[in-house]
């Protein structure tokens, strides 16, 4: 969401929604690799602000037939309509993915969207805090009890016949 245009995302994923008869979700991430941002004229230090602003626009593009919008990170829109429109007027379900950012958990809760905690290398307690924040804010924003909050979890594993082989093969990376 940080290095892509929300208008392009709105139109591309509404089209995909039509092609697959609504059987899709969209998972958005902020990105955590600094060198990628300049390829798109962005600065990783603006990552949170870009994620918040770009998603606010994407959310509006899918819900308003005509959008007048101005922000800090893209050109303004005046009387703009994203096409195609979401299938049956229902935008795709969105997951906000995060490795470490409480702001993204807050954003997911605010909109009533899913929160995907992608555990790459942080301790479990870190993700417990992120998910706890999301659940608390989910309730705060009136979406229901904390246990009804929509949480997804991810992780990585590198497996070999024995742990030493796995360590030796993966260590260079």
Residue ranges and their predicted role:
Residues 1-173:
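N-terminal glycine-rich cofactor-binding segment that shapes the pocket for flavin-like pterin cofactors
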């Amino acid at each position: 969401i940080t290095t892509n245009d929300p208008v392009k995302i709105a139109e591309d994923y509404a089209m995909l929604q039509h092609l697959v008869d609504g059987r899709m979700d969209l998972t958005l991430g902020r990105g955590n690799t600094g060198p990628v941002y300049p390829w798109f004229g962005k600065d990783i230090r603006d990552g949170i602000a870009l994620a918040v602003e770009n998603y606010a626009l994407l959310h509006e593009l899918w819900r308003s037939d005509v959008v007048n919008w101005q922000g800090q990170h893209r050109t303004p829109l005046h009387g703009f309509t994203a096409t195609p429109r979401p299938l049956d007027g229902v935008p795709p379900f969105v997951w906000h993915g995060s490795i470490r950012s409480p702001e993204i958990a807050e954003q997911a809760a605010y909109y009533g969207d899913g929160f995907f905690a992608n555990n790459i290398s942080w301790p479990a307690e870190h993700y417990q805090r992120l998910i706890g924040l999301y659940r608390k804010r989910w309730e705060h924003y009136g979406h229901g009890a904390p246990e009804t909050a929509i949480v997804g979890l991810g992780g990585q594993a590198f497996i070999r016949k024995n742990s030493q082989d796995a360590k030796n093969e993966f260590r260079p990376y």
